[in-house]
Design a protein with these regions (language model features):
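C-terminal motif of bacterial Sec signal peptides marking the signal peptidase cleavage site
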Residues: 20-22
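Glycan-recognition and catalytic cores of secretory/periplasmic carbohydrate-active enzymes
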Residues: 24-474
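Extended rod-forming repeat segments used as scaffolds/tethers
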Residues: 11-12, 252
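Bacterial N-terminal signal peptides that target proteins for export
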Residues: 1-11
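Hydrophobic helical h-region of N-terminal Sec-dependent signal peptides
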Residues: 12-18
């Protein structure tokens, strides 16, 4: 390079270094050279905080450095919920500690009522996933025992489970449930049937799902609240919001995981009705509000942050264009407030509940779209969401909820799903790994990974009691 100006060369080199260092930055924000490692470290820090301040309790309260329980006694929800994230992130020591504790010290002979839906997705789902990931027979025994304690709830005239069940006596109560509480059992119960060889669990879940589907309206929509004893609709509002959301999720994912053709038929008809009646355009954005299940007429423009899961479901089921359109709406709401508010009215442009509880749904959807399309804008979203959580929700102990997304006032609660879902989805998005992908794995509504690639199709059919199906719903 005889005759070249050495200072000019140094300048070019420095410019190149600065350019490369800036790759991955968004709008000049802090650059994270190893975001997967950062998420992994933060997960370990949160778990250590749980052990220090809330060991043996269900939930960590980061601001008061204490713990709390859902019911009269602990059900050890945080450890069971957190296990699969520890495995996915390679936090082997922490995973082994949880595994040993659950296998040796946890029991569910508890003389109090529990919410069937909530403990199914967290505890039963966590235990069954724990067994698949570890092969620990004592964990499968715990899962079967817990599943048996939930089964009495399904002994209703319709097959739809009661809201409450006593884990010791099997007594039930609560005859009005929403559709999500009625139809979010197929994955957990199905995996339990697969591993135990007893179809009773999957068949109970499927009977409940079928009971909802067969009560759909003439235009193919379901309502929100139903009476488990009479099968009559109490609330005819139809939507994809909290209260119905995971019913639709499990129709598709149940088929995806187990290949049950009845679920695929239910899904195809259901999603066609949803896409026909529920989306609403407002100022270049697409919202999924609430409609009357019988007429399809829009009745409300109230949405919840849980609804942000829908782009992930649309994307994985092949409706990518609709998924991208809806994700743009939720990203707009996040950008407006930082973390998104819990309840928002899009017609009135009004926040009805300003809390943010470390929810994973928008992160889940951004990861699905990143995984399925490879479009850089979804990675940009994920990086922004992570930076916002670090800025607004991180504490010197762990992470905590926000009381108000406008003021960023913190609230003393770290939901168990933050360990199970939110951190896991961030890690999966940022990490270079091929074990837990959308091709190999079906993630439950609590983000517990079920390895589809490890299931034997013949065993699935036999253990779940799958048989040729005839549509008799009319």
């Amino acid at each position: 390079m005889k005759g070249d100006n050495p200072f000019a060369i140094c300048g070019l080199i420095m410019a190149a270094v600065l350019f490369l260092a800036g790759c991955g930055q968004k709008n000049g924000e802090n650059y994270h050279p190893d975001p997967a490692g950062e998420v992994r470290a933060e997960t370990g820090r949160c778990w250590d905080a749980y052990l220090e301040y809330a060991r043996g309790d269900d939930v960590l309260l980061p601001l008061s450095r204490s713990g709390t329980n859902w019911y009269e006694e602990s059900l050890n929800i945080s450890p069971v919920d957190a296990f699969s994230s520890m495995v996915v992130m390679g936090l082997t020591g922490k995973a082994d500690t949880i595994l040993e504790y659950v296998a040796d010290s946890v029991d569910y002979v508890k003389d109090f009522d529990v919410k069937v839906f909530e403990v199914n997705i967290r505890i039963l789902g966590g235990l069954v996933s724990m067994y698949q990931l570890s092969g620990q027979k004592r964990v499968l025994e715990k899962a079967r025992d817990f599943g048996d304690r939930l089964l009495p709830a399904f002994n209703s005239p319709t097959g739809i489970p009661y809201f409450w069940v006593n884990l010791k006596t099997g007594e039930v109560k609560g005859s009005r449930v929403n559709v999500a509480e009625a139809g979010t059992y197929l994955l957990e119960m199905g995996m339990l049937s697969y591993f135990t060889g007893d179809p009773v669990y999957y068949q109970a879940a499927k009977r409940s799902t079928r009971a909802i589907y067969e009560r759909r309206s003439e235009i193919g929509l379901v309502g929100e609240v139903i009476d488990v004893e009479t099968g009559e609709w109490i609330n005819p509002s139809s939507h994809i919001c909290a209260g119905i959301d995971s019913y639709y999720e499990y129709l598709y994912k149940g088929w995806l995981l187990f290949g049950d053709p009845e679920l695929k038929q239910m899904w195809d008809e259901s999603i066609a009705a949803v896409l026909r009646y529920i989306p609403e355009k407002r100022d270049s954005l697409t919202w999924y509000g609430r409609v009357d299940m019988h007429t399809g007429e829009h009745t409300s423009s109230v949405v919840t942050l849980w609804d942000a899961f829908m782009p992930s479901l649309l994307a994985v089921s092949g409706h990518v264009e609709e998924a991208e359109e809806l994700q743009r709406t939720w990203d707009w709401l996040w950008n407006r407030y930082g973390p998104e508010p819990m309840i928002y009215d899009y017609r009135k442009d009004s926040i009805l509940n300003p809390q943010y509880d470390l929810n994973p749904e928008i992160i889940e959807s951004a990861w699905y779209l990143w995984e399925l399309t490879g479009e850089q804008r979804y990675m940009d979203m994920l990086q922004e969401y992570w930076e916002d959580l670090l800025e607004y929700c991180r504490t010197d102990v762990a992470f905590t909820a926000l009381e108000n997304v406008i003021t960023k006032e913190k609230r003393d609660y770290m939901a168990t799903y933050f360990l199970a879902e939110t951190l896991k989805y961030f890690y999966l998005a940022f990490a270079d790994q091929q074990m837990y992908t959308l091709k190999t794995t079906v993630f439950s509504t609590e983000a517990h990974p079920f390895l589809k690639s490890a299931l034997d199709p013949e065993r699935v059919n036999r253990h779940l009691g799958l048989a040729p199906w005839i549509d008799r719903s009319g």
